[in-house]
Amino acid sequence: MTQSLINTKVLPFKATAFKNGEFVDVSEKDIAGKWAIFMFYPADFTFVCPTELGDLADHYTKLQELGVEVYSVSTDTHFTHKAWHSSSDTINKIEFAMIGDPTGQITRNFGVMIEEDGLALRGTFVVNPEGEIKIAEVHDLGIGRSASELLRKVQAAQYVANHDGEVCPAAWQPGEETLTPSLDLVGKI
């Protein structure tokens, strides 16, 4: 079994991303002091990937309202991201950074590299303002992810971070009751 990345710091990285029609440099310094999502996917110009990224683009405004920056990452180059962004109506609506990781450094740092293929698994990681990974989810290549569930998880992670001693139960939504673990609760849930 591999070691969990939960509560570990994001390792240093430098990359070039395509964002808002420009190539921009991105590093771990860009996430300091804010919440961030890293969404790894296998490749541009494929099948499940645009459905996931389009879904995430539809939720980007809500995530930004929560102070969350989004980074999609594949082992394609930033040039390939630009070409895909220019040719696909679904991908064209993306406003978040599309990181090119052709060396696989970032993909390996997050433990989602498929070495024999040079591609990333479908990995999603939520990072807190201290640079610690708080949520890690990895899917098989054939299983797409839900941005609405990711939004809910981010809201839960932020709630727990701001409410010491409280935890969010399954399917928790903002405004619903949380739990405060104690001896009194044992066996009563």
Regions found by a protein language model. Give the residues of each.
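Chalcogenol-based redox active-site neighborhoods
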Residues: M1-I189
